[in-house]
Amino acid sequence: MDNKIILDQTYFYPTSGGQLHDTGFIAGKRVVDVFKQGNVIIHVLSGKHEFPEGEEVECEIDLERRLQLAKHHTSTHIINAAARKVLGNHINQAGAKKDIDKATIDLTHYQSITDEEIEQIEKEANKIVKESIQVQSNFVPRTEAEQTFGMNIYQGGAVPGKLLRIVNIPSVDVEACGGTHLKNTSEAGEIKILKATKISDGIVRLYFTA
């Protein structure tokens, strides 16, 4: 554990939900990885440290990286909603990965997505971006969230816990999600869908940037 550190509280986001971790510094030492083990968040440093237990440390997050990951995460929600509008209500997220350079979203769909449909989804997604909609996030008891928003809040799989963080883009998309997000859809800039690939029966993967 001499290159790993556990804090009593942290702003660093661990790799989770298909989103990569934050990087930055703890007491001037570079943080190269952050992951969750059970209920504990572990920060991996680039070298050994000698912090005694109980020492107070200053943390600094790489905000440029955080913003880019947030762009791709919010854009995942936007594209999911846009695809549902273009292709039909059977569309759900089956998985996603948010990286720095690009991101992917896996959608439930019974056939390959055509170039024309990709263009329509991209157009609809950028329409949502240009509408400059505030992205809301609140913690809501599970039962209340399910009764208010329905079971479609579970995109990409069930979320554990009695209290859910609900990310709501009003009139666009509502999901239970623990990831980092933009404050407004306009911050996503331009969404560009690079390609679509059928990865298995009933699952199509979209590659995109924002």
Segments (PLM) and residue ranges:
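A glycine- and charged-residue-rich anion-binding loop/surface
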Residues: 1-210
